[in-house]
């Protein structure tokens, strides 16, 4: 996580056969910085990239990723809406005006390249990465209705994206019923660590 531009954390899961990234980043620059960090650790670019939700800081780098992208069907629906809005060349300026972090990330840029994910799922799907399993599932969340989480049972790690946060695209509204449903879902999963996109990893009981 990079607070000066509010870049979300991009995670990497390595199996014996395949690798997986969590989220596609804020921009082409974000993706390139992530891949540069992977190369410095002698890690290859990911075979799969799973999107946690449609918000632009998690998806506007999707056009520059390697491998195959995966998202919930609602995520692609929202991204298609963003594509339509981006047909208006002024849309990037509107986003810059509305979000100072976006303005910093896209300083000097005057166009957007918004794409949808290659693979859509509805309820859940599983990837065998080679002695590492990624359980990908949709869940109720107060943050966004297309929320995807990724559970790695061998590591007892649960990637939550921004799922516990309020809905910033709805006036910062926090639906407590949805939050309670999400908390119950988290507690039902055998994980030791929960990884959110904009803060340090937490132990489950935190």
What kind of feature is each model-predicted range?
Residues 133-186:
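Active-site-proximal loop/helix segments of hydrolase catalytic cores
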Residues 72, 151, 178-206:
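Divalent-metal (often Zn2+) His-rich catalytic cores of metallo-beta-lactamase-fold enzymes
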